[in-house]
UniProtKB/Swiss-Prot annotation:
Major localisation: plastid
KW Ribonucleoprotein (keyword) present: no
Biological source species: Chlorella vulgaris
Name of the molecule in the record: tRNA(Ile)-lysidine synthase, chloroplastic
Gene3D superfamilies for the chain: HUPs
Family as reported in the entry's similarity comment: Belongs to the tRNA(Ile)-lysidine synthase family.
E.C. designation(s): 6.3.4.19
InterPro entries (UniProt xref): Rossmann-like_a/b/a_fold, tRNA_Ile_lys_synt
Alphabetic keyword roster: ATP-binding, Chloroplast, Ligase, Nucleotide-binding, Plastid, tRNA processing
Superkingdom of source: Eukaryota
Comment field on protein domains: The N-terminal region contains the highly conserved SGGXDS motif, predicted to be a P-loop motif involved in ATP binding.
Residues that bind ATP: 35-40
Amino acid sequence: MKKDSTIISTCNEFSLSSVKTKRVYKNNHLLCSVSGGQDSIVSFFFLVNFLYLSKNFKLIKSKLSSFSVASKSAEKKRCFDCFFSLKKNKKINALINKEKKLSRLDLVFCQHFWQTQNFFCVEFLFQLTFFFDIPYTFVLSKNILVSENRARGWRKKTFSRLLKIQKLSTIVTGQTKTDTAEKSITNLLRGTSPKSFSLITKANSKTTSSFFCFRLFRPKTFYLTLTGNKRERKVNRRISFSFYRTQKKDSKKLRETRAPFFIEMASFSAFFGNTFQKKKSSNSFLLYKTRLSFSFCFSGETREHSINSLKPLQNRNRYHISKLVKFYKFPLTIDATNFSLNFSRNKIRHLFIPFIRFLFKLKFETLLLNFLYLVNLEHEQIENENLELKRVLNFLRINYLKKNFFSSNRRSFFVIQTGHKNNNVFPTKKKEKRWFYCNEIGISKIRKQCKIHEDPILETSLVIYFTSVLTTSRKYSLLQNLLYNYREIEINFRQISKLENSFW
């Protein structure tokens, strides 16, 4: 009994952590990715629980009772007792009644064609979704997925495409604390930056654009209607038009009673009379580089679609989830790909992490995640400071443009004063001729009367000064945020780090 109570309490903790996330209730319709393993199956059962608690609990109770009687075994009935244990918890019911409820849940499964057992997994998921009456999407890979990175990129593209088609913004994955630790170790061994090494990473939703042409073709040439990244021919076209316009003069009374903000409009009439004057006006305009064909073109590059990933099991270990699966006898499918040492992720999972646990610490995952949390805080602080410097740079550039365009007599130029102890940067107006020169870059002289095309030189000089004041760990991220063409600059990062003594 004690074991059952502890497992039910952990199950309730899982459900409370997922209920408190506001993303579930901001988006009524969720998309859950299922692979047949223990992590995805546990997250699926919790989402099914919330779905039926929000709709009607009596229907699922009758279905489960009939299923348990037909099976005549206590073990199969035991796997569905989590629904009743969760319903008895008052905190969950209070949170569900207050917030917006979950209305619909969809499943998606990606077939990689790595093992023959994946086809049995498809059959298992079909039975599971048929029993709970949940929509199910089955995605096949066109290309051969040799490496794990290519498979991960393919899954991201398929998820983003499904979310765009169904007009959703949230996908649920069964990622645990152990998965985040393994992912961070793999990124660390690849030599990643602190941005990708941190816990919070934005999902990439870029997909290849597709061109859809709604025309009738023969079956032999039907494949030409759907082509990826099709380039259209663009030419200059002149469109001429002509129309008849009738005019009527306004009377004095209308002018007197008219409001000051009245919009003048031309009067039109289908009748011919003395009051109206029929005139023909013709005109033409030039369309610069327009499309030659005006068929329906839909591109995914112009639309911005934000994707949010919901992870209800991210605060739990894989060991606790395996205990939960064994106690409730959840149906699973074992994939042999997770045990092959051809993939680097499996080497870290089965060799590297157990070896570190045996030698040093049993709580290696929690300690690593705490370190990642501190790295994430430092990275956010650096990004906020870079945004502040970007605002200062934009303020200096806009103020310079105002002085350059709106001064009637003389154009003034902002000179950067260096040599102060506090390294303060502020704009000053000088009447004397000053210039800014750097030996390693070779920037030309910037005088008092500077032209419009010399504004990028000023911006580059300001960025170089900011990078010389900052520490070495923040210079590279600042250059990426401020300079749009930082890859086209002739100098490298080491030369920029040595620019502290190069200012005059």
